[in-house]
Amino acid sequence: MIFDKGNVEDFDKELWDAIHAEEERQEHHIELIASENMVSKAVMAAQGSVLTNKYAEGYPGNRYYGGTECVDIVETLAIERAKKLFGAAFANVQAHSGSQANAAAYMALIEAGDTVLGMDLAAGGHLTHGSPVNFSGKTYHFVSYSVDADTEMLNYEAILEQAKAVQPKLIVAGASAYSRSIDFEKFRAIADHVGAYLMVDMAHIAGLVAAGVHPSPVPYAHIVTSTTHKTLRGPRGGLILTNDEALAKKINSAVFPGLQGGPLEHVIAAKAVAFKEALDPAFKDYAQAIIDNTAAMAAVFAQDDRFRLISGGTDNHVFLVDVTKVIANGKLAQNLLDEVNITLNKNAIPFETLSPFKTSGIRIGCAAITSRGMGVKESQTIARLIIKALVNHDQETILEEVRQEVRQLTDAFPLYKK
């Protein structure tokens, strides 16, 4: 019987070796990809539970299948915790991803072909904010706003003038690579001025918002979407919030049956665990530490004239650095740092001149290293190691020194091995 197969290591050695190799990579690499984090063992345990066996199309108390009394409890816990965590009246926890959450929000608010104002990808937006290669850009008429050419920050007066000109049905705020605090109240005022809905994608900053160390979009947006990983430190999944009952019904219909069938109740259980963790007062200390670490790391780059810190600083968990004075492009920087066990990603910078496959910049985030217990001192050390590697990218002896220093850091802050 299948139940006799035992654990993965015994049953499928080939697969287990790949999983184990990834565990070792995470343990011994410094993770700086801004969209990644390290979940608790409790989150992993919930996601690996027997809930994966259960189909439950519909919503708690209104399912299409029988035997859902237990998963109803699980999903209701997740919903109520999400509402409490973010101060929202309604929450949908079924979206499989942030992209699915955004798609559902669009379906609830607008029709195909409607005009939407969203942040340009090169300025820090996301694929689902109107990229022509994404469903959003193919389905809706997106017009992009950017950042100010001088400050590399959002210019709300310019966005208002653009909104007046294009008269969007929806304005999308939020970003995947914007290092500054976003004024959601101003965005709502702009939306109201032109009679548009406001949707905020807070996927990257959700943990900071939950902890109260970043302004919340919930009081201002008609709909807020998010992922449940990144700074929120939960499983990979989506979340949709609103304070409008009529929109809540449209959101639920858009998710199911509009976009998805059965929800992933094992992932929803893991979301519930993550929400409970984020409701703990200690989570605020964690979120503040992310901001402190990010600011400390960014400051090291700001003080080195061989690098250019985009917008001159950071208010959240992420920052971007133009690396082209020391290495040809961001792709080469990413690959080089991979070789010394520092993981981050190439990233376009505002008014990018290189292709998206190369880019002028790199994106750095501090959520994962903060989860490991690293602080300001370690963040500054990591910045110096990155600089040391990039400046000496053709010096193997120095690169080996960086590898050894990285290993010393990761050994001092073990991930799951105690």
Swiss-Prot record:
One GO MF term attached to the UniProt entry: glycine hydroxymethyltransferase activity
Pathway where it operates: One-carbon metabolism; tetrahydrofolate interconversion; Amino-acid biosynthesis; glycine biosynthesis; glycine from L-serine: step 1/1
Modified residues (N6-(pyridoxal phosphate)lysine): K230
Protein's UniProt keywords contain Amino-acid biosynthesis: yes
Pfam (any one): SHMT
CC terms in the record's Gene Ontology section: cytosol
Catalytic activity entry: (6R)-5,10-methylene-5,6,7,8-tetrahydrofolate + glycine + H2O = (6S)-5,6,7,8-tetrahydrofolate + L-serine
GO BP annotation list: glycine biosynthetic process from serine; tetrahydrofolate interconversion
HAMAP family given in the database record: SHMT
Protein family per UniProt: Belongs to the SHMT family.
Subunit structure: Homodimer.
Protein name (record): Serine hydroxymethyltransferase
Organism lineage string: Bacteria, Bacillati, Bacillota, Bacilli, Lactobacillales
Originating gene: glyA
